[in-house]
Amino acid sequence: MESILTSIKLLLGIGEDYTHYDPQVIMHINSVFSTQLKQLGVGPEKGFRIEDDNATWMDFIPEENEEVTWDGVKSYMYAKVKLMFDPPTSSSHIKVLEEIIKEFEWRLSE
């Protein structure tokens, strides 16, 4: 299974081997894990955090099921981290990302 950090970096357009922004990306990923996803009831009850590129999506959600899919969680994580780490300059693009986030929050909370 793929690394959480690596998959989000690639979605953000950051190369896997480029580590300069890792601390900031990790901070934003952990923020999403500790606040939004935990409040939505997704993932371990005690919470989850990463420290490097060793943590995988399988560590966060041990097995994919009908209620929560890895792709839904990954897309949600990407959209949230994108808004915090590298927000779009266009207000219409920001609005689209915010609407996507709301849709995923609704779907993940069911």
Predicted features along the sequence, with ranges:
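Positively charged, aromatic-accented nucleic-acid-binding surfaces
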Residues: N65-A79
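Conserved short "hinge" loops at termini or chain/domain junctions
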Residues: M1-T69, K102-E110
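Protruding loop/beta-arch "assembly-hinge" segments enriched in small, turn-prone residues
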Residues: S75, A79-E110
